[in-house]
Amino acid sequence: MAENMTIATMAQPSESPSKSGEEAPASTNPAATSAPPRPPRVPYHQIYKLPAPIRTFPLPTFYPSNPLSLFHLAVAWLRQVLLPPPAEPSVIHEGIWDPDTRSVHVKDPKSIRALWEQGFYGKGSLSRSEPNWFKRELSRRGLDGTTVSEERTASRREERRQVKWERAKAELEAIEKQKHEEAKLNSETVNAAIPEPPAAEIEPEPEVLLSSLPDHVLSATSTIPLSRAAPTNEFVPKTVAHGHVEPKPPVGPLELLALPNSYALVRGEELALSQPEPAPTEENVRKELKAPVGPIELLALPNSLVDLVALSVVSVLSEDAGVDEDESSTEDQLEASALTNDEPETSATEANDSTSSSSPPHTDGLPDSQPTQENVPATPERRKSVRFSSTVESTTFQHTDAASEVKNNNGSSDVEVFSSFVSAVEKPVILNVEPTVISQELVDKEHFQLAPEEAFFLTFGLGALRVVDPVTEAPISNEQLLIKLRANSYFPPRSVDNLSPEDPFLVQYAVYHHFRSLGWVPRHGIKFGVDWIIYQRGPVFDHSEFGIMVVPSFSDPRWSEFEHEESKKTWSWLMGVNRVLSHVLKSLVLVYVDVPPPPVFDEEMKKGGIAAALKKFTIREVMVRRFSVNRNR
């Protein structure tokens, strides 16, 4: 395969040897000595020591200056010849082809960990990359004391967000303080520029003798200024003959910023000042709400819909209660006035058993000839007949009942009824059934997904994976799997007769196989708007440094005889992708894939199979850097 590499691989940083011989100083803190020691953590370079799901047995290094190294080399070679290790790959994992998701699913936990730890293949169906949903659920339920990478990432992001918020707050406070100091300095400068009147021009006020004033003036006067008040340092604007403030040209920054932006704003202010301001009402106050942007406002929000409904109902009930209290106070006053004018009652029984035929009482100061309302008592409550039942039953509050009454039949308020209703909704309904033991066993519901390129590389390139049919459970050969993956790279899937060398799967797999062969770890880069992102060692050790965009190229002149789809990329697309990658500290690499024409590809497939056909794809990399005047001089 003809390849032109323009990307210089970065040298891996040499790991400094650990100073195991040096002992740590003894801790004098008693809390540190009493805390239980943590279990030793396995280093990452031991967990992910295999770059591929196969094992290699290299021979020891031979040093010509050391004769013993030759003996070591001979012993290792004889051991591998006489007692050869098992053929690699010794473990073949099994995956199931899923046509719905167009991926290969792996469900064996051992195979999942092996494929992830030995090359970073695939991703968890319920996770971002590493399949740790089960550990995350254990940590969330408190069944395991360990933490997962997602929780640590979330905590770091929260710390960064809090630091940014504190920094912005400090900057805003500094700006406000600077504005206040500038305004104070500006006012002092203006006041100092105003000349004070000379002392000779100030006419002294005549002295007033209190003894010379009449008595009625002394009694009406509380205090009399005996001297002229000292001039204040506050700014006093000059006035002209008409009594208006003398306008000054806006020369300072504060005056320029205070000017209106257009005549419409000036006209609007004049209209607003001319119209009387309406009195604030409760509805207007309620409408003046601000968006909760601070941490205190966010914490003040209700936690659930039940709390929100409770707050609204309580506010409505409080308003109704206030209105009813006013009405009840008026009724109490009327009842008190009626009781003072009525005759004294003999007993409560006579008052309750009185009928409508009794004569109404006469009010004082009104003649008998004045028409009065008959059969209407002074207080409606005195006309009611109260009877108690021998059986007392609790009142049932239905969900559809309106919460407009302040008092219920049992004497409880609507607020108490609604609070009991909310507590009943939040509490689980306890039925009269036998208690059953709920199993606390957590089932792992996550499976492992392999992309088509990853699955075919493990199957064809390494031979460490066997893909089976989901219906017949029969193994799928490499040729059949290639045809299936090529057909499903289109939507909807194409038939076998309509396939060509420019299939998206062939182009993408050529790039994936190319970078895997060079030792990189390519993974899908849809998150960053690119086709692939490549890691030097893996996502556990470092961040990806490059983003890959695959561009098919039809440079062979024989492509003019066949229909093919040219890539339609614009400069705006290129600048947009480059800007996105620059924000995440990645470099854009355009990978041009020279696709062979159909006759050449079909001929190589018949002669040498898949390997011979893939050799006809040529890879060319072009690094794209954003031009900067300061950096590219």
Swiss-Prot record:
Identify the domain of life: Eukaryota
Report the source organism.
Neurospora crassa (strain ATCC 24698 / 74-OR23-1A / CBS 708.71 / DSM 1257 / FGSC 987)
| EC number(s) recorded for this UniProt protein | 4.6.1.16
Please spell out the taxonomic lineage of the organism that makes this protein. Answer: Eukaryota, Fungi, Dikarya, Ascomycota, Pezizomycotina
Stretch forming the signal peptide: none
Similarity annotation: Belongs to the tRNA-intron endonuclease family.
Q: Which residues form the active site?
A: Y535, H543, K586
Keyword terms, alphabetized: Lyase, tRNA processing
Which regions are flagged for Polar residues bias? 1-19, 387-410
Q: In its UniProt entry, what is this protein called?
A: Probable tRNA-splicing endonuclease subunit tsp-2
Q: What are the boundaries of the region Disordered?
A: 1-42, 320-410
For bias kind Low complexity, which ranges apply? 24-35, 346-364
Against PANTHER family, the record matches this protein to: TRNA-SPLICING ENDONUCLEASE SUBUNIT SEN2 (PTHR21227:SF0)
What this protein catalyses is: pretRNA = a 3'-half-tRNA molecule with a 5'-OH end + a 5'-half-tRNA molecule with a 2',3'-cyclic phosphate end + an intron with a 2',3'-cyclic phosphate and a 5'-hydroxyl terminus
What GO annotations for molecular function exist for this entry? Answer: lyase activity; nucleic acid binding; tRNA-intron endonuclease activity
What is known about its subunit structure?
tRNA splicing endonuclease is a heterotetramer composed of tsp-2/sen2, tsp-1/sen15, tsp-4/sen34 and tsp-5/sen54. Interacts directly with tsp-5/sen54.
Provide ranges: composition bias, Acidic residues: 321-334
